[in-house]
Curated annotation (Swiss-Prot):
GO terms for biological process: cellular catabolic process. Disulfide bonds join 75-93, 251-259. The active site is at residues 199, 320, 451. A motif (Prevents secretion from ER) lies at residues 559-562. The gene is ges-1. It comes from the Eukaryota. This is Gut esterase 1. InterPro entries: AB_hydrolase_fold, CarbesteraseB, Carboxylesterase_B_AS, Carboxylesterase_B_CS, Type-B_Carboxylest/Lipase. One of its GO terms (cellular component) is endoplasmic reticulum lumen. Keywords: Disulfide bond, Endoplasmic reticulum, Hydrolase, Serine esterase, Signal. The keyword Endoplasmic reticulum applies. It holds the Pfam family COesterase.
Amino acid sequence: MRVLLASLLIFGACWAGPVVNTNYGKVEGFEYGAAEVFLAIPFAKPPVDNLRFEKPEAPEPWEDVYQATQFRNDCTPHYRLVAQFSSYSGEDCLTLNVIKPKTIEKKLPVLFWVHGGGYEIGSGSQHGYEFFADRYTSQGVIVVTIQYRLGFMGFFSEGTSDAPGNYGLFDQAAALRFVKENIGNFGGDPDDITIWGYSAGAASVSQLTMSPYTHDLYSKAIIMSASSFVGWATGPNVIDTSKQLAEILGCPWPGAKECMKKKTLHEIFDAVETQGWTTGTIDILRWSPVIDGDYLPKNPENLINDAPIKPTLIGMSNKEGSYFATMNMGRVIADFGLSPEEIPKVDEDFISEIIDRKLLYNNRYGENRQKVWDQILDYYTKQGKPERDLNGFYVDRYAELLSDITFNVPILREITARVERKTPVWTYRFDHYNEQIWKKYIPEQAKGSPHANEYHYLFNMPVMAQIDFKKEPESWLQRDLIDMVVSFAKTGVPHIQDVEWRPVSDPDDVNFLNFQSSGVSVKHGLFQEPLDFWNNLREREGFDLVDPAYSKTTSNSEKDEL
C-alpha cells in the first residue's frame, strides 16, 4: 500500500505544472511546447454585488495553489447575443493570462496586451495562448493578456463622483499594476513593460499613457488602429445612455447606481434590447470612457501635455472604415454597414443623406450646419471624381469618410501631438490585403486593408478569411509584423528587414513605413489632406465632428450632451 501511495505521489509530482509565487498566493500553470502558460489569474476582487459599478479592489490572498490552467469567465459584453456566443461569460471576470518561456536566463521584456472590441465586446481568451507561445515568447518576451469590464458594466456613468464611469479603464490600470508588482516572479522585467493594443485596445493604451494612475507603470507603447483622440473613445452620449437605461429599468435618476446593482444581467440585457445596442450615429458607441476628472482629468488633446516621454509605435490600415462600411462587419457596435443590395445604389445623394442623418444630427454646427454639410459633401464626393465607375468611387469615398473621422484624423492628431512634445514616435501603414477577405460584389476601387486586417497576421485569427501563411507574401508580412512588435518591445526601436525606419521628424509631413504586397518602404505625408480638411473645419467652426468632447463651442443641444 505504501509503495502504491508513493508511486501515486511521484506520478502526481511528475505531472504537476510550473508554480509561481505572486503577492496574493501561488499559481500553477502548465507547459505548452517551450512555453509556460498561466491562465485566468485574478488581479482584482470579483466586481459583483456591492462592487458592481465600483473601482476594482485588490484580490483577496489565497492559501491553496491557484489552478491557472484554463480560461474562465469573459467579461459581460453589452449585448445578449454576443454573450451567448461566449463559452464563458460573467461578471466575475477580472483575470489576466501570462505566457512565458520555460527557460529564462535574464529578466525579459513584457508585452501587455489590451484587447479591442469598442469597449463593449472582446476578451483575453479570444486570442488563445498557442500563437503567442509559438511566435512571441519564443523570441524572448513575456506576453500578458488581460480582461476588463465592458459595456454597461464597465462604463455606466451618472457623471458624478459617486458614479463616474470608466470602471473598465480602472480595471486595465489595476491589471497593469498587478503585472508591475508580480511579473518579476515570472521572469519578467517590471521596468520594461510595453503596453499594446488594437482598436479600442489601442485607444485604451493611449489613455493608459496619459492617465495619472499609470504614468509610472509602463516603458513603451504600441497603439494600433485607434487613439484616445477619437470621438468614440470619450463618448459624448454615455451619460444620456446611462440615464435612459436606468429609466427603462425603473431606477431613479440621479442616484441610479444602487438600484442598478440589484438588477440581474437578464433584466439589464432586456433593457438594452429596448434601448438599442448602437447609436446609429458617427459617435458609434453607446458605452465608452468619459472625461471624469479622475482617470481622465481632461480631454486627451490637453492631457497628452502631461504624459511622460516614452517610445511609441503607432500604426493603421489604409482603408480602416471599410470594415464597418463595405464589409458590413462589427454590426453589434456600429451601424454603418452596406448590404450587397445597397452597394450598387451608393451615390452622392446617399453620402449626403448619411452626412445629414448620422454626422450632423442634433443640429450640430447650429446656424452653420448647411454650410458645413456642403463642405463635407464637396470634399468627399467632388474631389478626384472620375468620369467612369462612379459607384466604385462613391463606395470608396463613403468608407473614407468613416475612416477619416473615426480613425485616420484622430490618429494623426495624436502622432502630431506626441512628436511636438519630442516623443520618439514610429509610424506605419498597412496597405496589403488578401483577396479572400473581399466579397466579389465589392467594387475594386473600394478594396484595401480594412480595420482588423492585421489580426490575421499578428494573431493568426481568421477574422475575415482563412489565410494560408505558407504562401508569399503572407508569410513574410506576418513575420515582419511580429518582428516589428517584438523588436520594439525588446529594444524600444522597431526593426523590419534592413529598412532604415526613423521616428517621425516633421509632424506636417509624417514619415511612415508602408507595408504593401510588393514589400516595405518608407513614405511621407500620411493622410495629410484629410487631416488638413478636418483641422481647418474645426478651426473655422469651433466644433469638431472628429472629437465632439474637444469642441470649443456647440449648439445648445450639444452643450447639454457634453
